Amino acid sequence: THFSGCKGKIRSVNGLYEGMMDDAINVHGTYLKIVERIDDCTVRARYMHGQAWGFDWGYIGDRVQFVRSRTMELVGNPFVTEIKEVVECLDEHKDSASPLYGVSHVAKEFIIRFGDVLPPEVSGYEGYVVENLT
């Protein structure tokens, strides 16, 4: 059972978890890879895992942090002032087991503007991701 990008409290009471193969409950956020620094306050960021597409990643006012992939170093702590989905057309998913079954359009990328000037090293060239802390 995975919970991703949730806010508030998650309670599991008297649950029976069998045949899960790994963690019975996995609570986590979803990173977006920085693929382009558009200007000092704006980036283009992308889901890199096919099972993550389609999640609402963030909202205006959310607080984020940047993470250098190679070292897990944390950089910056700005808040989102604008977020725009970059929607792609897909071949409609035919597999009824897929969470995207029947979906023909999905947001894989976002243009995200922040309330602060970004650290200079945050770009599409330095291997950074953005994590929503809210």
Where are these regions (language model features)?
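Extracellular/periplasmic carbohydrate-active domains that bind, remodel
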Residues: T1-T134
